[in-house]
Amino acid sequence: LDFVDKIIGISSDVEFEHFDPGKLVPTLEALDAVSSGSVDAAYATSGYWQGKINSASLFAAVPFGPEAGEFMGWILYDDGAALWQEMYDTNGYNVVATPCGVIAPETSGWFKNEINGVEDLEGLNMRFFGLGAKVMEKVGVSTSLLSAGDIFPALERGAIDATEFSMPKIDARLGFHKIAKFNYFPGWHQPSTLFELLINKDVYEELTDVAKKQIEVACLANITTNLAEGEATNYAAMVDNVENNGVTLKQWSPEMLALFEEKWNEVAAELADGDPFFQKVWADMQEYRAGYKVWSNNIYLPRN
């Protein structure tokens, strides 16, 4: 884990030991384990807690939401980080959350068959993450959240028909291309994905101020290198998939993207209506994004 290397390199007051996902506790139980003190800390993405906290994925990945630069602006220079911690506090979790990573957009999914319209999605079983899963359910897909090591076996035995997980470089390590030959873009469900360092609050409060600052600095460095690596290395995996693995790269049609966005707006409205804290975070993010457009619409060259 890059963060552990960074903190070891600069720290005089705190030490981390890295264990692979699932080694100490199951991935999806990491939040509870840190909160209870079973483990001191976990590096994760808050979207894994979507089943526990409706607003969790707003601090991980938002369908049709902010890309990395815009997202980090909200987190580090607006209200995002404070709301992130407030989410855990109000839900009774004994943790301190530090923003600690961000990755480039993900692929939209790996499918065994070409998807020509919404009718081809209906009835599929698919591994899907976070808020995007609720969108897929609205178009007829049955979704489940599987940790990384469980996805390929599920694809192989037919328990799921399709999956999304991460960027092409990371997906390549998991071997999805061996079974699902149609890789769809863009990753509307995760235009960027944030990661967090969770530390048990009692453990954190025992740290020196120097140690807390070293953790913060290591996480900021991790954010920078995460993003740069994602931008620099994914095209090679895409080329390799096409040239050597028989993968077809597909783009969702404008009609399909419009459908996904329509369903996302329905999901967001439903969650906001039923959860005051989701509404609070969602409104804050939307206010920030409206202001951000004054900058982004004027300063950046057209993308297409």
Spans of features found by a protein language model:
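N-terminal secretory/targeting leader peptides
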Residues: L1-F71, E86-N304
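Divalent-metal coordination cores built from histidine and acidic residues
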Residues: L83
